[in-house]
């Protein structure tokens, strides 16, 4: 197939998923071209030897003061703000080139800014498949402390109502466009059943689960000597739950308390500093690291004794499976997609977001050699049998071939069916 790809992703799990899919499809002989912008992460270390053709089109992100003022007035009438206009201009320019390229299918990945890509409304000559990692959770969940639609405290001061008049109306416009754009795609793929449930809650429609996989060649089991420390992976942001991990380690008696090594590629600032201070207060040796090479990451996955996974409602999460591939058991909070990748008592231990319960699970893995060896063996087989790279490419390839093989009438019927509510 001749496949066009569009994305606006930063570094992280979504970008790794994109690279894996492109690599796997390219190795099977499919011709691939990528559309993106300078603000996205297009370094693609996993694709250096394949060198797919990359088109970088302008995406304006800077908003001038007068545009901000105009957006505020426009929000009163539920008009589009400049951010949406800029993204639509970029998406339309990309779509014009894709429409003219005679592709068999378009694979669209998530948008770092809006989550839901806008490009679907402009692609009219080619079947289009959206791989959506998650909806815009800020618009539909209590994030981080309250739902963004929650009314402010009662007040009689007009100045205090600015957020309600302008900011919240802009959010409502974003949500309007998010829902409208969802229905422009011929098929929507998701990374877990949890993500599929999120689609139903956000859009009233489900997608199709298309599981990702792990390339064992990139995360090999090296059979190195294990050291008594706990490892965490994830950006230094609040939703990764680093505070939960620190509190869990702190429940382990001081004389046997392991250090907590945390590896992340992004984030910092106030939350990062707060976690360093929290660890000091709790008596936890906390070693945050950033931007490790693949070789360094694999080595530490092969020398740690346990991975603690505390992300909040993570839609999928690569880290537990990467750890399993390296023979590392996982202690995880039972939230989000991790309930599909970590089976309690098989390749790890799953429990509630309770530091005491998590700490007890960590101690069990750290101190019970028989349990550790059992989880290690199961973990490697779990990845090999259920989450292989080749199987994940089989799934995405089949989904794209199905979309490419549909006629215009069938695709139009599919698009209409997406608009029907689930009963």
Where are these regions (language model features)?
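Short hydrophobic beta-strand element within catalytic cores of glycosyltransferases
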Residues: 329-332, 342
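Nucleotide-activated donor-binding/catalytic signature segment of Leloir-type glycosyltransferases, i.e.
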Residues: 272-298
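Glycosyltransferase donor-sugar binding loop
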Residues: 36-41, 259-274, 290
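Aromatic "clamp/platform" in nucleotide-sugar-dependent glycosyltransferases that forms part
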Residues: 312
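Conserved donor-binding/catalytic core segment of Leloir-type glycosyltransferases
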Residues: 189, 222-240, 246-250, 260-263
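Conserved acidic donor-binding segment of nucleotide-sugar-dependent glycosyltransferases
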Residues: 344-345, 349-356, 364-370
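Short alpha-helical donor nucleotide-sugar binding micro-motif in glycosyltransferases
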Residues: 299-304
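Membrane-proximal helix-turn-helix segments that form the acceptor-binding/catalytic region
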Residues: 136, 147-188, 196-197
């Amino acid at each position: 197939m001749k496949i066009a790809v569009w994305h606006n992703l930063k570094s992280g799990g979504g970008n790794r998923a994109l690279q894996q899919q492109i690599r796997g499809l390219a190795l099977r002989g499919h011709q691939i071209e990528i559309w993106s912008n300078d603000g996205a992460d297009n370094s693609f270390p996993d694709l250096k030897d394949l060198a797919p053709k990359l088109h970088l089109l302008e995406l304006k992100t800077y908003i001038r003061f007068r545009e901000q003022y105009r957006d505020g007035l426009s929000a009163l009438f539920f008009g589009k703000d400049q951010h949406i206009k800029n993204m639509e201009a970029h998406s339309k320019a990309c779509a014009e080139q894709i429409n003219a390229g005679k592709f068999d299918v378009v694979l669209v990945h998530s948008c770092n800014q809006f989550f839901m890509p806008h490009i679907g409304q402009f692609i009219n000559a080619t079947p289009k498949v959206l791989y959506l990692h998650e909806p815009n959770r800020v618009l539909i969940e209590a994030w981080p402390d309250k739902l963004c639609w929650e009314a402010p405290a009662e007040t009689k001061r007009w100045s205090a109502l600015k957020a309600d008049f302008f900011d919240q109306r802009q959010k409502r416009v974003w949500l309007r466009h998010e829902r409208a754009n969802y229905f422009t795609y011929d098929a929507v793929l998701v990374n877990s059943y949890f993500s599929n449930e999120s689609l139903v809650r956000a859009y009233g429609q489900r997608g199709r689960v298309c599981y990702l996989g792990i390339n064992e060649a990139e995360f090999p089991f090296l059979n190195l000597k294990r050291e008594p420390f706990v490892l965490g992976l994830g950006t230094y942001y609040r939703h990764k739950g680093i505070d939960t991990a620190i509190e869990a380690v702190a429940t382990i008696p001081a004389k046997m308390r392991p250090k907590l090594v945390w590896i992340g590629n992004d984030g910092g600032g106030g939350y990062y500093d707060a976690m360093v201070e929290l660890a000091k207060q709790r008596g936890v040796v906390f070693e945050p690291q950033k931007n490790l090479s693949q070789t360094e990451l694999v080595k530490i996955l092969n020398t740690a004794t346990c991975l603690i996974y505390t992300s909040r409602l993570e839609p999928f999460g690569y880290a537990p499976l990467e750890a399993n591939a390296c023979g590392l058991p996982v202690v995880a909070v039972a939230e989000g997609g991790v309930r599909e990748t970590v089976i309690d008592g098989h390749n790890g231990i799953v429990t509630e977001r309770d530091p005491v319960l998590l700490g007890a699970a960590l101690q069990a893995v750290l101190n019970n050699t028989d349990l550790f060896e059992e989880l290690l063996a199961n973990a490697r087989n779990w990845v090999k049998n259920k989450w292989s790279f080749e199987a994940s490419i089989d799934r995405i390839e089949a989904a794209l071939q199905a979309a490419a093989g549909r006629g215009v009438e069938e695709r139009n019927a599919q698009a209409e069916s997406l608009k029907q509510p689930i009963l």
